[in-house]
């Protein structure tokens, strides 16, 4: 079977790139959804802009580590990943509210 994944380069340009060979996070989300399972450890030995690590963070349930030799990209990737971690997801927020409501019932 053939699988075709269409990438929107305009979306990547809109997000802004920090690395010359930066891949879209959606590409990594797609690959990881096919091959990674909850609890797996993901290693990116050439993290670059940290797109793979951002995808792991968004998917959740994956341990991940990345290496980057270039200090400029390392710093930018760290900043990008920290910004991603700081984002509250709607479903996470709803889950937290649900848990809070359940604990106040008893």
Q: What do these predicted regions represent?
A:
Residues 1-106:
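Class I S-adenosyl-L-methionine
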